[in-house]
């Protein structure tokens, strides 16, 4: 991608910052949806999905905050600005961290699953705040460059690599969460006969799932 005529090469941070910000929000919505299904239909797999998404979501939120600070210094002249989107993204990080810490503190699996599901569902209220904070309050963040109904504001030499990065991030996240889910299932079922058979026979878990 070419240099930006105003920001120079510093705008390239966007190719990591924006995909990580989008993905950490998507993962939290995924957790909230899984929590709702788990509470209504009592599906154990939903708690597995939530536990698998937490570490990646927390890491990506941290990446979004750090890269945002790195981008903000040359663009805004400051490492940190207490505007709506920055603060709501920080709240998202604390939600991830809080759920992670709660899961470590609670030993009973049923109580852990229910508490996690409730907090995940309530926390989804923060996602629209992140999304629409640039419209609701004064903020240094610019409105969305990409919309479904309008042509991208940036040239194709810039938005095509950006699109590749977003798709790549989502593919990585999908693979990571599914892999963590498989490992979590094996851990929870470690005393089951079928898991012992896999361990003793040397078969790969992909033949089971």
Regions found by a protein language model. Name each.
Residues 1-209:
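Polytopic transmembrane helical bundles with strong interfacial aromatic enrichment
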